[in-house]
Amino acid sequence: MNVIRIYGKDFTFCELLYTFVAIFKKRIPVSMQTIQVKDKSFSLFISEKEILREIKRIAKQINKDFQDKEPVFLAVLNGSFIFAADLLKEVNLPSEISFVKLSAYQGVTTTGKIREVIGLNVDLTDRPVIIVEDIVDTGLTMAHMLDVLKQQNPASIDICTLLLKPGKLQVDLDIKYCCMEIPNDFIVGYGLDYDGYGRNMRDIYTLIKN
């Protein structure tokens, strides 16, 4: 496991992430009914209280399903970092977590095809794997990620997503753990962004359409 030394003290990447999220949340404004992110306005859609309630529900199911197992959680950056931190705090299993990014084929922007998973530092052979994602919409990127991960011969692969847009799915995915299904609206907050902004909001907001 990678260790980072800061002021003479060693930290794992996960420890730094949890610390960062805790500090991040302390500086986040309290819930607001409407927010402005760059040139767009958004209204409150899902409160932090609702989000955390659903995360606890999902974590409880994961604890039950993976009892006596040691799963590997693969949290997909950038969007899932807050979700992953809150989820793992509710998981009481011996487990590992790796924060990964997806590398797309150059010039491909609509097919979702990826060529590799960057940052994976855990051997997945014969290990149960849980992919942690912020949102699944078309499902194309997730489907290709599954193809890439299967080449490492894990014991199993399950998908855990904070949000799912069933009306936008273009592929058949078996999503075992889903906190909430939502309509096909543009949203920000709790890790989700608009042009890089808005990830730091405690709640999830939906675009106000003119």
Describe the residue ranges of each PLM region.
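PRPP-associated nucleotide enzymes
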Residues: 2-9, 13-210
